[in-house]
Swiss-Prot record:
Protein's GO biological process: negative regulation of intracellular estrogen receptor signaling pathway; positive regulation of cold-induced thermogenesis; regulation of DNA-templated transcription; regulation of stem cell population maintenance; regulation of translation; regulatory ncRNA-mediated gene silencing; trophectodermal cell differentiation
Post-translational modification Phosphoserine, affected residues: 299, 540
Binding partners and assembly: Component of the CCR4-NOT complex; distinct complexes seem to exist that differ in the participation of probably mutually exclusive catalytic subunits. In the complex interacts directly with CNOT2. Interacts with TIP120B and NANOS2. Interacts with EBF1. Interacts in an RNA-independent manner with BICC1 (via KH domains).
Lineage: Eukaryota, Metazoa, Chordata, Craniata, Vertebrata
Descriptive protein name: CCR4-NOT transcription complex subunit 3
Gene for this chain: Cnot3
Low complexity composition-biased segments: 257-268, 441-450, 473-498
Length: 751
């Protein structure tokens, strides 16, 4: 009886210890999980280990009592044993977590901890991708079936069932492609975080039902499947798959240019053909603000002769394709086409703005350039003395005679060439030159009078033409006239009138040309007075050009700078006449280069882009240097510091000998070697160390000394125990089993 009471008392004490131990274990467990740093975790883990050891001893005691037959009621003992085993399992988990190295097999095998929201997003994205793939596969199957059925129906005509099946398959293909398009848009929105995952989950069941059952006869499609996602309001960047073709403005320009009747002397734009360019290339060029070669031709009205193409290349001005070398035009020259009864008319401007000879101005479909260039065409023909033209005339590429012999004073080279105005070029010149007279020349064979402007100071020698068009005169009397201002699609140019001062003698008026014939279709003729008005001052001309450049700002993609012929005449005749005027100097108008790069103006940056730009700008001021990756060395200033007079002011005698250095301690020698680089002291310290059987390792930059005889010696290395001086920790270390390769041994004989 006493034994039983004693045993029961022991059991009660043991169970009490178990409950206290479990409570203590729980407390330490909580502290371990709330620990802020690794040191605390290690401490709590050690405490946990002690506590679990105590519990394990109590468990062993409980197990012996459970196994004995003396105790009848063992339920309490078994419960406490299970409680201890539960704590042991929990400790194993902690031990596994702390002992698992980051790059061990177990550590690498553990599942990566992923943010639940990110994981959900990836799952939905994967589902969208799989659904799109499934739909595309079904589309391929439908298309192959349609193809095979089409072959069969061609052989057997009138098979209505197969025709119905083909129609049904085509409807399925169309529906599938619609869903693929929508799902791809949703996927892009998901990648850009512009749609919620929950919104996609709402349509998931309907989409899966469509994919699985779209071909069932009793299938009912949900037509409002994507309505809740507001796919109509998504940004254009998410759905645009190809660049738009022609903008509305370009279509309008094209319609205007094609609907305007072409006069006998107006230049009409040639649409791009496969021989010279493609629509896609020209579109790309427009987008980039580049200029392509302009192709403009004069259209003879009645003679059916071929239009003349003028391809201008500023890189080779010595041999321009369509311009004979002669005086270059500044603003205009008068040309006439013999096909119209020889009527002389002012030639229309042949810039990229389009023909302006007819009353309604027509526009070439060039770039909607905000950089209208106020230019007079530059000299493209080489070193010839430039002569100005009357303001009512227009440059022509070369006025040819008729089939008969031309009189010797007809200027076949009156037309100079305008070099190609590149859309990315920011400089446009306004040129003014010496005075000129209007000379009248009549062509013989076709009774057509061809008026041209040329210098009268010297003999009129016709310059040889280098182009095919101007060198061949048509026998039917068709004059080959090439356009003079070859401004291309890179940007429209604004023709600024540049008046000239008259010679002392009166010049023949343009009214004499009316005797040759009447104007059929073209603008009203202008007859000049015997005295041509003098030019405005250059400052007003420059201000005109600057106003033109300023008014075509970045904000306005379609500039409205179009001068009519009336404006040109009025502005050119407004200044009072003067008897003599020195030649005007060259002036330039500057237009920002950025307009050539982005003709539609710069796109405003987002906040994120502005932030990135600021960060890049800041980083640019602190560029990394190769020395940034080097080990930081202690800086020892070399400047002498004042010392008290009772210290030695001179180094001791014989302190620069090897014997002196050999008497120094090893640590002092190492200090001299590592911190007095490039000095004689370093050299002497190295010499002293070598005499003490230290050897320098060039790979580790450390001094090694044999601790014992090497265990292995070969021609390439020796292996054994070494003592080395660690200059970073500043102390000697022992390394066992070190392989000293002789190729890293610094073995120069220090003399």
């Amino acid at each position: 009886m006493a034994d039983k009471r004693k045993l029961q008392g022991e059991i009660d004490r043991c169970l009490k210890k178990v409950s206290e131990g479990v409570e203590q274990f729980e407390d330490i467990w909580q502290k371990l999980h709330n620990a802020a740093n690794a040191n605390q975790k290690e401490k709590y883990e050690a405490d946990l280990k002690k506590e679990i050891k105590k519990l394990q001893r109590l468990r062993d005691q409980i197990k012996t009592w459970v196994a004995s037959n003396e105790i009848k009621d063992k339920r309490q003992l078994i419960e406490n044993r299970k409680l201890i085993e539960t704590q042991m399992e929990r400790f194993k988990v902690v031990e596994r977590e702390t002992k698992t190295k980051a790059y061990s097999k177990e550590g690498l095998g553990l599942a990566q901890k992923v943010d639940p929201a990110q994981k959900e997003k990836e799952e939905v994205g994967q589902w969208l991708t799989n659904t799109i793939d499934t739909l595309n596969m079904q589309v391929d199957q439908f298309e192959s079936e349609v193809e095979s059925l089409s072959v069969q129906t061609r052989k057997k005509k009138g098979d209505k069932d197969k025709q119905d099946r083909i129609e049904g398959l085509k409807r399925h293909i169309e529906k599938h492609r619609y869903h693929v398009r929508m799902l791809e848009t949703i996927l892009r929105m998901l990648d850009n975080d512009s749609i919620l995952v929950d919104a996609i989950r709402k349509i998931k069941d309907d989409v899966e039902y469509y994919v699985d059952s779209s071909q069932d006869p009793d299938f009912e499609e949900n037509e409002f499947l994507y309505d809740d996602l507001d796919l109509e309001d998504i940004p254009q960047a998410l759905v645009a798959t190809s660049p738009p073709s022609h903008s509305h403005m370009e279509d309008e320009i094209f319609n205007q240019s094609s609907s305007t009747p072409t006069s006998t002397t107006s230049s009409s734009p040639i649409p791009p053909s496969p021989a010279n360019c493609t629509t896609e290339n020209s579109e790309d060029d427009k987008k980039r603000g580049r200029s392509t070669d302009s192709e403009v031709s004069q259209s003879p009205a009645k003679n059916g002769s071929k239009p003349v193409h003028s391809n201008q290349h500023p890189q080779s001005p010595a041999v321009p394709p369509t311009y004979p070398s002669g005086p270059p035009p500044t603003t205009s020259a008068l040309s006439s086409t013999p096909g119209n009864n020889g009527a002389s008319t002012p030639a229309a401007p042949t810039s990229a703005l389009g023909p302006k000879a007819s009353p309604a101005p027509s526009h070439n479909s060039g770039t909607p350039a905000p950089y209208a260039q106020a230019v007079a065409p530059p000299n493209a023909s080489g070193p010839s003395n430039a002569q100005p033209r009357p303001p009512s005339a227009q440059p022509s590429g070369g006025s040819g005679g008729g089939s008969g012999g031309s009189s010797s004073n007809s200027n076949s080279g009156t037309g100079g060439g305008a070099g190609k105005q590149n859309g990315a070029t920011s400089y446009s010149s306004v040129v003014a030159d010496s005075p000129a007279e209007v000379t009248l020349s009549s062509s013989g064979g076709s009774s057509a009078s061809s008026q041209a402007l040329g210098p009268t100071s010297g003999p009129h020698n016709p310059a040889p033409s280098t182009s095919k068009e101007s060198s061949t005169a048509a026998p039917s009397g068709a004059g080959n006239v090439a356009s003079g201002s070859g401004n291309n699609s890179g940007g429209p140019s604004l023709l600024v009138p540049l008046p000239v001062n008259p010679p002392s003698s009166p010049t023949p008026s343009f009214s004499e040309a009316k005797a040759a014939g009447t104007l059929l279709n073209g603008p009203p003729q202008f007859s000049t007075t015997p005295e041509i008005k003098a030019p405005e001052p250059l400052s007003s001309l420059k201000s005109m050009a600057e106003r033109a450049a300023i008014s075509s700002g970045i904000e306005d993609p379609v500039p409205t700078l179009h001068l009519t012929d009336r404006d040109i005449i009025l502005s050119s005749t407004s200044a009072p006449p003067t008897s003599s005027q020195p030649p005007l100097q060259l002036s330039e108008v500057n237009i920002p280069l950025s307009l050539g790069v982005c003709p539609l103006g710069p796109v405003s940056l987002t906040k994120e882009q502005l932030y990135q730009q600021a960060m890049e700008e800041a980083a640019w001021h602190h560029m990394p240097h190769p020395s940034d990756s080097e080990r930081i060395r202690q800086y020892l200033p070399r400047n002498p510091c004042p010392t008290p007079p009772y210290h030695h002011q001179m180094p001791p005698p014989h302190s620069d000998t090897v014997e002196f250095y050999q008497r120094l301690s090893t640590e002092t020698l190492f200090f001299i070697f590592y911190y007095l680089e490039g000095t004689k002291a370093q050299y002497l310290a190295a010499k002293a160390l070598k005499k003490q059987s230290w050897r320098f390792h060039t790979k580790y930059m450390m001094w090694f000394q044999r601790h014992e005889e090497p265990k292995t010696i070969t021609d390439e290395f020796e292996q054994g125990t070494y003592i080395y001086f660690d200059y970073e920790k500043w102390g000697q270390r022992k390394k066992e089993g070190f392989t000293f390769e002789y190729r890293y041994l610094e073995d120069r004989d220090l003399q």
